[in-house]
């Protein structure tokens, strides 16, 4: 038995300089596991609650001392003596202790910190790398990275409404080569921007945040960068979009909700018109994935988008599903989207995270493991991606050490797996077969 003998929670800073929760879990054997939780900028309304202090005189109200106090008192009392290898029981203990549907009392940032730290300690105790602890002998598939090279929306201060424009190296023979292709394209794009006199400052997730004429201008610059890096758009490197459409779904002039695209000259579009615009881009450019193409509350819009594009491109629900099996099941039943974004802090425990991944796979939906815009050096999501054979990961651009921590961990895992490592490439998009 790997009994938990001590838990220490603390407040640290994330990649945006905002407080977040870190947790150390000590086992009877002397083994320790440490984990830190991420935080999002654009968040779904039904995400598990991230507990913040609200004291405007300290970290602008974003302190997490309350969550840390919960960790060091009642959470510690509840889990001391439990077997760290019994992850599901431990996570149920945390859920029951909180007693709310959305972890509003203790905070998902507190429960997740413990959940991840316990898993790390148990893996260390068992002598297994974390990805192997999660996936057993079956975890050998590296994820295809969706690399956010242009930031907009809530992740940048520019003219773009869409939050992320991504490159996806579907034609690479290995994860190592996929990272190289992405890095070379990133640097080619940087030179293109520099030569045009456009800022090469980066956003929260390491992508560039240029002010350009419109979204197509940004897409065309990315395609130019792919070409200048020596790769073929579509065949070797495809494109993905994260619209984060909830962020620009607003009341129009007559009071009805519309998609307000300031980056397209102030267009106000219905769900049908916005779908038509997306469909036009899909026909024109090698786009194979669209995340949050409609607002989280616009289920009718989602149904129309899925009907029009669901067989052509991956339609990922992030704010739509918030890593929640109840909401995902509703989407599956209604034929909404064909993929789910997996963000561990949207739900607050590893057990619930794995349940969402498994439900998606059973329904033929893909599961894309994802970072948040506020990250730390914690690389747990890299191990989750391989351990669950998810096949896809979103962990930012090719800059900022908080993003590189995940890519570098995946490079180590691929090296550790050796000849049995699998890089699925386009086959990771099995929802489009």
From Swiss-Prot:
InterPro entries: Enolase (IPR000941), Enolase-like_C_sf (IPR036849), Enolase-like_N (IPR029017), Enolase_C (IPR020810), Enolase_CS (IPR020809), Enolase_N (IPR020811). Pfam families: Enolase_C, Enolase_N. (2R)-2-phosphoglycerate binds at residues 163, 343, 372-373, 394. Binds a second Mg(2+) ion via substrate during catalysis. One of its GO terms (molecular function) is magnesium ion binding. Mg(2+) binds at residues 242, 291, 318. Pathway: Carbohydrate degradation; glycolysis; pyruvate from D-glyceraldehyde 3-phosphate: step 4/5. Its EC number is 4.2.1.11. It catalyses: (2R)-2-phosphoglycerate = phosphoenolpyruvate + H2O. It is found in: Cytoplasm; Secreted; Cell surface. GO terms for biological process: glycolytic process. PROSITE patterns: ENOLASE. The active site is at residues 205, 343. GO terms for cellular component: cell surface; extracellular region; phosphopyruvate hydratase complex. Keywords: Cytoplasm, Glycolysis, Lyase, Magnesium, Metal-binding, Secreted. Its cofactor is Mg(2+). NCBIfam families: eno. Belongs to the enolase family. Catalyzes the reversible conversion of 2-phosphoglycerate (2-PG) into phosphoenolpyruvate (PEP). It is essential for the degradation of carbohydrates via glycolysis. This is Enolase. It comes from Methylibium petroleiphilum (strain ATCC BAA-1232 / LMG 22953 / PM1). The lineage of its organism: Bacteria, Pseudomonadati, Pseudomonadota, Betaproteobacteria, Burkholderiales. The gene is eno.
């Amino acid at each position: 038995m790997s009994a938990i003998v001590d838990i220490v929670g603390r407040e640290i800073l994330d990649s945006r300089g905002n407080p977040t929760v870190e947790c150390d879990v000590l086992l009877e054997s002397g083994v320790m596991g440490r984990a830190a939780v991420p935080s999002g900028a654009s968040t779904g309304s039904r995400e598990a609650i991230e507990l913040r202090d609200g004291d405007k005189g300290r970290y602008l109200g974003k302190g997490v001392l309350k969550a840390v106090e919960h960790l060091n008192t009642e959470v510690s009392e509840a889990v001391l003596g439990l077997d760290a290898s019994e992850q599901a029981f431990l996570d149920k203990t945390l859920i029951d202790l909180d007693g709310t549907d959305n972890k509003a009392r203790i905070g998902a940032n507190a429960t997740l910190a413990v959940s991840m730290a316990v898993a790390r300690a148990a893996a260390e105790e068992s002598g297994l790398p974390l990805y192997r602890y999660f996936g057993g002998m079956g975890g050998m598939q590296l994820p295809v990275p969706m690399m956010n090279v242009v930031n907009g929306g809530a992740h940048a201060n520019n003219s773009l409404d869409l939050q992320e424009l991504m490159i996806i190296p579907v034609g690479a023979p290995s994860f190592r080569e996929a990272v190289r292709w992405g890095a070379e394209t990133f640097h080619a794009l940087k030179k293109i921007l520099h030569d045009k006199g456009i800022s090469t400052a980066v956003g929260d997730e390491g992508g560039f945040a240029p002010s350009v004429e419109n979204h197509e201008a940004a897409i065309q610059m990315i395609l130019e960068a792919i070409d200048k890096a020596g790769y073929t758009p579509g065949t070797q490197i495809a494109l993905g979009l994260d619209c984060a459409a909830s962020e620009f779904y607003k009341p129009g002039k007559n009071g009805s909700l519309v998609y307000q695209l300031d980056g397209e000259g102030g267009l106000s579009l219905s769900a049908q018109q916005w779908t038509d615009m997306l469909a036009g881009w899909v026909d024109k450019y090698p786009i194979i994935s669209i995340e949050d193409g409609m607002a989280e509350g616009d289920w009718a819009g989602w149904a129309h988008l899925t009907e029009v594009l669901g067989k052509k491109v991956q339609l990922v629900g992030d704010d739509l599903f918030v890593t929640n099996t109840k909401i995902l099941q509703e989407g599956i039943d209604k034929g909404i989207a064909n993929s789910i974004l997996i963000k561990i802090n949207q739900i607050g425990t590893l057990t619930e995270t794995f349940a969402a991944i498994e439900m998606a796979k059973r329904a033929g939906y893909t599961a894309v493991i994802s970072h948040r815009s506020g990250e730390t050096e914690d690389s747990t999501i890299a191990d989750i991606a391989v351990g669950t054979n998810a096949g896809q990961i979103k962990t930012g651009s090719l800059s900022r050490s908080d993003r590189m921590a995940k890519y570098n961990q995946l490079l180590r895992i691929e090296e550790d797996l050796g000849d049995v490592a699998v890089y699925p490439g386009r086959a990771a998009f099995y929802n489009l077969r």
